[in-house]
A protein has these predicted regions:
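Nuclease catalytic cores
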Residues: 1-170, 211
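Conserved catalytic cores of phosphodiester-cleaving nucleases, focusing on short active-site segments
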Residues: 54, 138-161, 175-208, 214
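Glycine-centered loop/turn motif at secondary-structure junctions
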Residues: 39, 223-226
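Short, charged, amphipathic alpha-helix that recurs within catalytic cores of restriction-modification
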Residues: 214-223
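Generic preference for hydrophobic/aromatic residues in regular secondary structure cores
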Residues: 43, 112-113, 188, 194, ...
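Nucleic-acid nuclease catalytic cores
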Residues: 180, 197-201, 225-235
Length: 235
């Protein structure tokens, strides 16, 4: 299927045509193909990648705020010293709360423009959450997933990261980020942005693969925030 993307390697693989094991696809790619055929969901294997990338792009100004004391001690630092800690939020609470409130009120075009502008003006700058040359961090993919979540859900997720500290919750995020495209909207600069009317997150489990504590945490978090999430068992 031409809509499949995956960043995985060295994993158990499946044949996409007859459901038998082969060297054709990982379990995540198998699942992507399944959701495409069954429900017309398009998507990416973006485990622990997509959400931190959107978090970083949308909060870039606050992350690199040089008014916070002692967090930048070298011009070679790629991120502030407290970035992964709970103190990151504590040290910038007022500015972060203001930015989250602003994002939460975004219209679709405002969300697109924010992600797009940061992505294109900061492209190439070393940081811990966006690998510019990796296709999973493709600008159009990140924008589509951002649209699929919508501003309010993104802010709810970001608040969880900020209050918990990224270090403690940066793993365990679902494997698949899926969305449905309902036709095409007008051409906007480089891309056609489809009307996206739903999002689904999926944790993929093969035989004998069990949920980790962080995976359970994120599944519970998404459920509590009204985000469609499920576990897919592949045998």
């Amino acid at each position: 299927a031409d809509s499949l993307y995956s960043s995985s390697s060295g994993r158990r693989k499946y044949n996409l045509t007859d459901d038998k094991f082969s060297e054709t696809a990982t379990v995540e790619e198998f699942a992507l193909n399944y959701y495409l055929k069954q429900d017309n969901y398009r998507g990416v294997h973006g485990e622990n990648v997509v959400i931190p990338a959107l978090y970083f792009l949308l909060l870039w100004e606050e992350i690199y705020d040089d008014e916070v004391p002692l967090v930048f001690q070298s011009k070679y630092q790629a991120f502030p010293l407290d970035f992964f800690e709970k103190d990151f939020y504590i040290n910038r609470k007022s500015k972060l709360d203001n930015k989250l409130e602003k994002i939460q009120k975004y219209k679709k075009d405002q969300l697109i423009n924010h992600i797009k502008t940061t992505y294109e003006t900061k492209n190439g700058i070393k940081n811990p959450c966006v690998e510019w040359n990796s296709y999973i961090y493709n600008e159009e993919i990140l924008i589509k997933i951002g649209i699929a979540f919508g501003p309010q859900k993104l802010v709810e997720i970001f608040r969880v990261i900020l209050t918990q500290g990224l270090k403690s919750v940066k793993t365990g995020m679902p494997d698949l980020f899926l969305w449905k495209e309902n036709g095409k909207s007008k051409y906007k600069e480089k891309f056609y942005y489809a009307e996206i009317d739903s999002i689904k997150l999926v944790e993929v489990k093969s035989v004998n693969d069990k949920l980790s504590d962080n995976q359970k945490f994120w599944l519970k978090t998404f459920c509590e925030n009204g985000i469609n999430v499920e576990v897919l068992h592949i045998k």
